Amino acid sequence: MSLSLWQQCLARLQDELPATEFSMWIRPLQAELSDNTLALYAPNRFVLDWVRDKYLNNINGLLTSFCGADAPQLRFEVGTKPVTQTPQAAVTSNVAAPAQVAQTQPQRAAPSTRSGWDNVPAPAEPTYRSNVNVKHTFDNFVEGKSNQLARAAARQVADNPGGAYNPLFLYGGTGLGKTHLLHAVGNGIMARKPNAKVVYMHSERFVQDMVKALQNNAIEEFKRYYRSVDALLIDDIQFFANKERSQEEFFHTFNALLEGNQQIILTSDRYPKEINGVEDRLKSRFGWGLTVAIEPPELETRVAILMKKADENDIRLPGEVAFFIAKRLRSNVRELEGALNRVIANANFTGRAITIDFVREALRDLLALQEKLVTIDNIQKTVAEYYKIKVADLLSKRRSRSVARPRQMAMALAKELTIHSLPEIGDAFGGRDHTTVLHACRKIEQLREESHDIKEDFSNLIRTLSS
């Protein structure tokens, strides 16, 4: 049996799986081949259960394809493989990390071998502010395809802060659950280590604190405070844009925390490299750990969010009513919850049962606005959901037909249904030139005449966006 068996499996899995999935679940595994058994060691029970549930068949299939009837049996363990091994027994991973998920920079200082999580002291500063909202936990975060990887990564960070995913960078549109996950991580860490110094903040508070420190000649105290935390959770990092002094100070804070194995989690409304006005050295560091997108929730997740929110308020929400609301409000979780709060308030005030007709009346102005309001953002979300791809794919440089055709469709719809100019549409699709938009519109127009499927897709999307 080849000693490179696990390396062969890794190479195939890296080709077959999305880069984020491979980096998150497969890369942390260690392997040992002995007595026709391939033992896979996971860093914790969460990773072990996930790999066994999601990838067991993939791995067994690869072992069979490589070894036939002599394929080894799989065994899963939590921990690390034994240190004392012969060279013939050790099997390790040598697959290069995907650049877009984890980037190792030559100038990065080597992490300290001493973990700051071995002996977490009680907070020393009387002005220490956690700001973690105890109401936001993993238990009340509704999981769906759109946020599954982000939740899983956040859960691992909460279980093993300062470990593999440092920094963790979550990005996506407004109201999709990024802030909820930040607080959930903070609560998870403090549940394990009650004395851990976990600080949640909006990026503008970091800027404000630094300005006050400069005004009061207290910059050294500022540095000590932020570099002594065990986990720093910063929301909306894009607001650092064009704030050069703040970026300079955060650059050094970032390096100090990483060297001390202190956890950093950042969120933004866009991919790190697409944040304008932020220094390249910072954007590069943002991608050192794991970068995960949160997409707008799909229909099933929107329904689940409404049902869970209603349950938390001891309100019986009929399934058909949840579906009615979810089908019409597609943009984000915050909008859904706001609509449901209005429905609940109206029901409490009037004493009426919650039916579709009641919801239609209670949300009359909101639904009327949704029916009239067709934006490029809405078109992108609708097209992505229709073709079962991500909004990020529409904005990417990918040219495969499975992405390029929906992108052309979305551009044509934007020209048809909005008042935006071709350059404005191009800019909304990843900064593309207006000639690209014009070509897309002409291509879809041609295909609508030649292909019944394209004609039907266009009609269905027009109907969905206009209804």
Swiss-Prot record:
PROSITE patterns: DNAA (PS01008). Residues 348-467 are annotated as: Domain IV, binds dsDNA. ATP binds at G175, G177, K178, T179. Residues 98-119 are annotated as: Disordered. GO terms for biological process: DNA replication initiation; regulation of DNA replication. Residues 131-347 are annotated as: Domain III, AAA+ region. It is found in: Cytoplasm. Residues 1-90 are annotated as: Domain I, interacts with DnaA modulators. GO terms for molecular function: ATP binding; ATP hydrolysis activity; DNA replication origin binding; lipid binding. It comes from the Bacteria. Plays an essential role in the initiation and regulation of chromosomal replication. ATP-DnaA binds to the origin of replication (oriC) to initiate formation of the DNA replication initiation complex once per cell cycle. Binds the DnaA box (a 9 base pair repeat at the origin) and separates the double-stranded (ds)DNA. Forms a right-handed helical filament on oriC DNA; dsDNA binds to the exterior of the filament while single-stranded (ss)DNA is stabiized in the filament's interior. PANTHER family: CHROMOSOMAL REPLICATION INITIATOR PROTEIN DNAA. This is Chromosomal replication initiator protein DnaA. It comes from Shigella boydii serotype 4 (strain Sb227).
